[in-house]
A protein has these predicted regions:
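Carboxylate-rich, polar loop motifs that coordinate divalent cations or form catalytic acidic clusters
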Residues: 1-175
């Protein structure tokens, strides 16, 4: 054994607007804690564990954020499990039956191309409410993050004109 057969990571600690402390619990040790990867320490001291099948047992749930709508975003940056998870609790932390949640591994851009990333590294929201995600293929933008849960959801890649008379463009920071 190389010493890495089991591990657990606590990461992405963030407070929500109700002063609840959220965190991720991920790792290679498929214990109950890791299979319930979102933990919340409520402001009253009570712990809540949330389980969503699409991210249960992922190795590296890291960066997190809350958007202006109160949705909780999580990046999985492990090579085999990279992707973005979004959770809308509908304001009911202790009732997950009404939650909307989705994990996207491969995004589709505005041209209908499925992006095969070699990593997802960071996430933030701009002043207009768009979500920016830093990937190994350059930034992608979720201009309407509320549509993340829809089947026909797509992201935008910024195109930089080549200015060589061909009307061709390259994606910003790709390759």
């Amino acid at each position: 054994a190389n010493g890495y057969d089991t591990f657990v990571r606590i990461n992405g600690l963030k407070y929500d607007n109700d002063n609840n402390l959220w965190m991720t619990n991920s790792g290679k040790d498929k214990t109950e804690g890791v299979l319930n990867p979102i933990k919340i320490l409520k402001s009253d001291g009570k712990w809540i564990s949330l389980r969503y099948p699409e991210i249960a047992g992922l190795n590296n749930l890291e960066r997190t954020m809350f958007d202006k709508r109160g949705n909780f975003w999580v990046i999985s940056s492990w090579i085999a499990d990279y992707g973005v998870f979004c959770l809308d609790t509908k304001g009911t932390l202790e009732d997950s039956s009404d939650d909307k949640h989705k994990f996207i591994k491969n995004f589709t851009n505005q041209d209908g191309t499925i992006l095969s990333h070699n990593g997802i590294y960071c996430i933030t929201e701009d002043k207009n409410g768009a979500i920016w995600i830093g990937t190994g293929q350059g930034p992608i933008i979720l201009n309407n993050p509320s549509n993340f849960f829809e089947d026909d959801f797509y992201c935008t890649q910024i195109k930089v004109p080549r200015d060589d008379g061909t009307n061709l463009a390259d994606f910003l920071l790709a390759n």
